[in-house]
Amino acid sequence: MVDSLQKPELEELRPGIKAPAKETILTPRFYTTDFEAMAKMDLSPNEDELRAILEEFRADYNRKHFVRTPEFDGSAADMDPETKKVFVEFLEQSCTSEFSGFLLYKELSRRIKNRNPLLAECFELMARDEARHAGFLNKSMSDFDLQLDLGFLTANKKYTYFKPAYIFYATYLSEKIGYWRYITIFRHLEQHPEYRIYPIFKFFENWCQDENRHGDFFDALMKAQPSTVRGFVAKLWCRFFLLAVFATMYIRDVQRKEFYEALGLDAREYDRHVIAKTNETSARVFPVVLDVDHPKFYDRLETCIANNNQLAAIEATSAPKPVKVLRKLPYYLSNGLQLLKLYLVKPLESDVYQPAVR
C-alpha cells in the first residue's frame, strides 16, 4: 500500500523547502529593465484610459477573495503520488511566475515613484495582486509539506534584462495567456467537478480577472507608446513574442501532459484553445498576429517536442559531455529551423483579422 501522505519525491534545499526548478528555456524567468526610460515615459497619448484602469486597480475587487476555506484541510492526502508530483510542479511554476511579476512591478513602482506617479501606482497595485497570488500558491504547496523560499529565489535567480518595449510585449502576453489558461480550466471543472483534484481551482474565475486587468493595463500602456505597436519593426517584434510565448507554453505543457490528464484535459487540445483565444485577444493591440491555423503550425511544434525528447534521452546517457554535445547538435539545429520557419509564415493583419474589435 502507498502512503497517501508521502511527500512527492522532489529535491529540497532543506526540510520542507523545495529547491528551485533547474533553469531551462521553458522555466519562468525574472526580469529587469531600463528604469530611467520608464520614469521618462510620456503617457499623454492614452492617459485617460490608464487613469481609468488605475481606478479599477484601486477598487481591488479581489481583496477578500484569496482566503483559504476548510475545504483545503487534508485535500492533498487524496492524491496519488504521481499526481502529487506533477501538481506540485504546477504550483511551483505558477508561484515562480507570479513572484517574478511581483518583483518586477514592485521595483518599477519604487524606482519611478517620484517622476512618473501614475505609472508607479499602477505597478504598485499590480505588485499587490501578484504577491497575493504567489502567497496563495506557496501556501498551497505547504499542504504537500513543501514551500518555495521566495527570499532565496530573489537573491539567487538570474535576471534577464529586457528594454521596456520587450517588457510590454512579454508581460502583456503573459497576463492575457494567464487569463485564458485559468478561465478555461475553471469552466472545464465547472462542467466536470469530478476532476477538481484540489480546491484552488475554485478560485480561478476571480483570479483570472486580475490577469485580465493587468493585460488591459499593458494594452493601454502600449497605446500610449505608439512606436511599440506601429510600423514594420513593431510588427516583427510582435510576431517574435507571440511565437516565443506560444511555442514555450505548448512544448512545456505537452511535456507535462500528466497534470492536464489529472484534470480530465488533453494538453494539446487545451493549449490549442488557449493559443487561439490569446492570439485573437492580441489582435486588439498588436498590429499583426500569428496564423495559428496554418497547417504546419502545430506540426512544427510537434517536431520540436520530438527533438526535445531525443535531447533528454541523450542527456540521460553516460556518454562524455563533448559526445553529448555533438549528438544533441542536430536536434538543436532542427528546433531552430522549425521556429524560424514558423516565424516566416505570413502573419495576419489585425485590422483584417478582427475588424469589429479594432
Curated annotation (Swiss-Prot):
Its EC top class is: oxidoreductase
Reaction(s) catalysed by this chain's protein: Mg-protoporphyrin IX 13-monomethyl ester + 3 NADPH + 3 O2 + 2 H(+) = 3,8-divinyl protochlorophyllide a + 3 NADP(+) + 5 H2O
Q: Where is the signal peptide?
A: none
CDD domains in the cross-refs: ACSF
Q: Output the Gene Ontology terms for molecular function.
A: iron ion binding; magnesium-protoporphyrin IX monomethyl ester (oxidative) cyclase activity
Q: Which Pfam families match?
A: Rubrerythrin (PF02915)
Kindly state a single biological-process term from the GO annotations of this entry: photosynthesis
User: Which pathway, per its entry?
Assistant: Porphyrin-containing compound metabolism; chlorophyll biosynthesis (light-independent)
The answer, when asked if NADP is one of the entry's keywords, is yes
E.C. number(s) listed in UniProt: 1.14.13.81
Cofactor requirements of the protein? Fe cation
Biological role stated in the UniProt entry: Catalyzes the formation of the isocyclic ring in chlorophyll biosynthesis. Mediates the cyclase reaction, which results in the formation of divinylprotochlorophyllide (Pchlide) characteristic of all chlorophylls from magnesium-protoporphyrin IX 13-monomethyl ester (MgPMME).
NCBIfam families assigned to the protein according to its UniProt record, in alphabetical order:
AcsF, PRK13654.1
Recorded family membership: Belongs to the AcsF family.
Q: How is this protein named in the record?
A: Magnesium-protoporphyrin IX monomethyl ester [oxidative] cyclase
Q: Name the species this protein comes from.
A: Synechococcus elongatus (strain ATCC 33912 / PCC 7942 / FACHB-805) (Anacystis nidulans R2)
This protein's gene is called: acsF
